[in-house]
Amino acid sequence: MIKTMNNCDFFSSPIGLGHVTRDIAIVNNLKDLSVNFVTGSGAAQILKKLEYNVDDVYNPPSFVVENGVLNNQAKWLWNYYQYYKNCKNISKKIIKQNNSELIISDEDFASLTIAQELKIPNILITDVLETKFTKGITSFIEKKMNKSMMNIIKNCDVVIIPEDGENIDNIKRIGPIVRKTNYSREELRKKFSFNKKTILISVGGTSAGLFLIQKSITAILKLNLDVEIILVTGPSITKEFENVRNLGFVDNLHEIIYASDLVISLAGKSTIDEVNAYGTPGIFIPIKGHFEQEDNSKNEGFSFEDINRLEKLILEKLDEKRNKINTNGAELAAEIIKKFTK
């Protein structure tokens, strides 16, 4: 068998779907590179659906979320550490087996550790430079983990951050990474049979967003508007809901976002970036205690408490004008990656 030049392993964190969706956007701009994805859960399902090469081998710990509040952060952190050790073994096997010449990681630190040990060029895509899950006595474990994370980051050939800002040392900030569509908004609305004002409720790749689905449906029905409610539940929620059209688990959320008139979503970065890029008004409610989502939603002017004023927000946002923002983060990321290929 002839070995493909530039064979590259792309380790994409399977915690939620935001990592893999931005990674797909990047790989769409890397046609000459033979890319093998390594991930798990819903992320692997999306890649299989889109017919990418994928090793479905990662099994991430799940967040315990009750009524929108993240519980047992310390336990989650401990489980994450065990998961990380397990991923190190898995990634080592894959990297050696594939004779990888380049490792790209979207917040999968295990594969970077191995790549750095084996002196293989390695690129990190991340929007988190430190975690802030725990307080008090357990936070010393997290501080220790952050320290080793910072070490890994420092040793990467390049770190790509999908936000606007300055480049420092090996860190390149390139702006949001968003999937492109080849259709106009009108074509998409026709394709999805959206005939009325359309409100999309989207909760990502975990079951953590159940609280938001229920609260949102209740608020919309209370307002008694002539709208269609579209639900995208991801791979983890199987509960049935009335008065909505449930699209379940999709691989083209960006197109549904573009076709919608309002998006109500958890505060994952990739969804927020896609909503902003396509100019659809959005309401972003974070999981309480999830530092990353709380930061993301704060940047957009929301907080967890907004869950109690959804009716008012929905009316305001349905009146808001669309404001499309051009982003080229995916192309810029691809350009950076190409420099590491022969």
Q: What do these predicted ranges mean?
A:
Residues 1-228, 236-342:
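Nucleotide-activated sugar donor-binding and catalytic core shared by glycosyltransferases
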